[in-house]
């Protein structure tokens, strides 16, 4: 049995006449089978060229017809074009067509309309059945191991949204990633369509809808803070280029971890300006640490504490603002319904504890990073993603690292953690909050390091100089409830070397460094 493949431009009148004759033959001959292929006029020539190169044929016009032997297999046999097929039909089957040129043109336009309508239906169907493409960078990191079960539980994107996870890392991590793939498949999650690995740089972020950027390992030894800052640039430049080139146009990028989170976020925005508005930094890890410390002090559950605000550098100089923080379901002489809450600062009578011990514990956690392990990082990322897609709890304040546009007097052009709420698939900065003003000295201290990090990383400044204030008391009386966590010590900010990171490709040398800065 032979099958004739008839391919042509959707608006080609000769294809229309060929199709009519082929339909007649298939209807009246038991062993005559046809397969039709139409292409839009603008892509026809490229498609035809690819087919001819693949089969080593020579054909330049529409339509093109070839035979495939279904019972034997093997290479298809080129029959030719419009004239050759009509000649074949007349000689073998004594069938001809008397279709007029005018009718051929009418049918050709109908074919084009039908082709466009079919394409639109297929695209609409794909949006319903295509899974959400989730990419995780540095997938050999511990946080990835803890993040996958949360993503596949359906809690983040919903039980009606299927996901495909791609684990991206270097070639040296491939065996570890293969083991991770097997474990992920063993979860038998109803929302997991597939899980795969990618170690080829040029294939990274193909059609990605969500990209999770985890802490990366360094591939060379660094001895100074300046070198460490500059070492972030090549990888962020590479990721930015690949995101612009390969990812879906509405991709969402979320940066998590404990080292240079704000810097990596602003660098990604610089090198992927097209989607800069969809790049955020996770601050819920620091927020969770603060809630846990407060909960231990108040002898309650961390989940009962709400509205802790993280200002500034997520992995460095930041302030934990407790002025809006409230505790629910607190066991005391005063009880109320579930929605009843009390200000945390009214329940902590020892103000010195807030100013000293609370700050010291936070500083120790930030400096060592030992408590910010895989579980906390994964949960913080997953929760932020959940809020991004489905909205944050009504009335609740969420801390998020985003590009400053001058809100709260923060300098423009730096990534800064500030209070927001999530709604309708995006975030809204809570600029209408009352009594959250921060003094100029404190704001300068927080922003100075972030600005210097960016300048040193980009080579616009040689040395990093920590901010020094001439004021003996940096925290005025009205801001005693801001807990300041100093920047982490440099040696603890350097990620441990595990595998060699993907190197920049040659095409990066020609990459133009577009920025989001005006």
Swiss-Prot record:
Matches recorded under Gene3D superfamilies: Lactate dehydrogenase/glycoside hydrolase, family 4, C-terminal, NAD(P)-binding Rossmann-like Domain
CDD domains referenced in this protein's UniProt entry, alphabetically: MDH_like (cd05295)
GO biological process: malate metabolic process; NADH metabolic process; oxaloacetate metabolic process; tricarboxylic acid cycle
Alphabetized UniProt keyword annotations: NAD, Oxidoreductase, Tricarboxylic acid cycle
Residues of the signal peptide: none
EC number: 1.1.1.-
InterPro entries, alphabetized: Lactate/malate_DH_C, Lactate_DH/Glyco_Ohase_4_C, Malate_DH_type2, NAD(P)-bd_dom_sf
EC class name: oxidoreductase
Pfam families registered for this protein in UniProt: Ldh_1_C
GO molecular function: L-malate dehydrogenase (NAD+) activity
Mutagenesis or variant effect for residue 48 to I: Found in a renal cell carcinoma sample; somatic mutation
UniProt record similarity statement: Belongs to the LDH/MDH superfamily. MDH type 2 family.
Protein name per Swiss-Prot or TrEMBL: Putative malate dehydrogenase 1B
């Amino acid at each position: 049995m032979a099958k004739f493949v008839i391919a042509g431009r959707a608006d080609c009148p000769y294809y229309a006449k060929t199709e009519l004759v082929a339909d007649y033959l298939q209807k009246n001959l038991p062993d005559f089978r046809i397969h039709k292929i139409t292409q839009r006029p603008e892509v026809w020539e490229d498609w035809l060229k690819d087919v001819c190169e693949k089969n080593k044929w020579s054909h330049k016009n529409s339509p093109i017809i070839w035979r495939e032997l279904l019972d034997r297999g093997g290479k298809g046999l080129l029959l030719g074009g419009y004239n050759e097929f009509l000649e074949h039909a007349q000689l073998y089957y004594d069938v001809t067509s008397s279709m007029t040129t005018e009718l051929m043109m009418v049918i050709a336009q109908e074919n084009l309309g039908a082709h466009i309508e079919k394409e639109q239906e297929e695209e609409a169907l794909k949006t319903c059945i295509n899974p959400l493409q989730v990419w995780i960078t540095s997938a050999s990191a511990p946080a990835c191991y803890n993040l996958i079960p949360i993503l596949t539980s359906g809690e983040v994107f919903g039980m009606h949204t299927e996901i495909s996870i791609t684990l991206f890392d270097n070639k040296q991590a491939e065996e570890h990633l293969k083991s991770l793939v097997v474990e992920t498949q063993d979860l038998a999650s109803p929302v997991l369509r597939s899980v795969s690995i990618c170690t080829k740089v040029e294939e990274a972020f193909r059609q990605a809808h969500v990209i999770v950027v985890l802490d990366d390992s360094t591939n060379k030894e660094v001895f100074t803070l300046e070198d460490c800052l500059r070492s972030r640039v090549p990888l962020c430049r590479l990721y930015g280029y690949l995101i612009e080139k390969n990812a879906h146009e509405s991709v969402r990028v979320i940066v998590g971890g404990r080292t240079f989170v704000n810097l990596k976020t602003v660098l990604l925005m610089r090198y992927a300006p097209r989607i800069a508005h969809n790049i955020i930094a996770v601050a819920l890890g620091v927020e969770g640490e603060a809630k846990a410390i407060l909960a231990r002090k108040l002898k309650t559950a961390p989940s009962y504490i709400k509205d802790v605000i993280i200002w500034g550098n997520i992995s460095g100089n930041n302030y934990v603002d407790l002025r809006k923080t409230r505790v629910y379901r607190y066991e005391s002489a005063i009880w109320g319904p579930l929605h009843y809450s009390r200000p945390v600062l009214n329940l902590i009578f020892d103000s010195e504890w807030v100013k000293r011990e609370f700050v010291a514990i936070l500083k120790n956690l930030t400096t060592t990073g030992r408590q910010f392990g895989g579980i906390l990082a994964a949960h913080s990322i997953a929760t932020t993603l959940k809020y991004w897609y489905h909205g944050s709890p009504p009335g609740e304040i969420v801390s998020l690292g985003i590009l400053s546009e001058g809100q709260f007097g923060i300098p423009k052009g730096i990534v800064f953690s500030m209070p927001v709420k999530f709604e309708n698939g995006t975030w809204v900065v809570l600029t209408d909050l009352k009594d959250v003003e921060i003094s100029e000295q404190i704001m300068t201290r927080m922003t100075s390091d972030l600005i210097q990090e960016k300048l040193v990383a980009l080579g616009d400044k040689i040395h990093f100089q920590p901010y020094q204030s001439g004021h003996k008391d940096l925290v005025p009386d009205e801001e005693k409830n801001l807990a300041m966590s100093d920047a982490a010590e440099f040696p603890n900010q350097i990620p441990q070397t595990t595998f060699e990171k993907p190197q920049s490709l040659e095409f990066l040398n020609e990459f133009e460094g577009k920025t989001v800065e005006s």
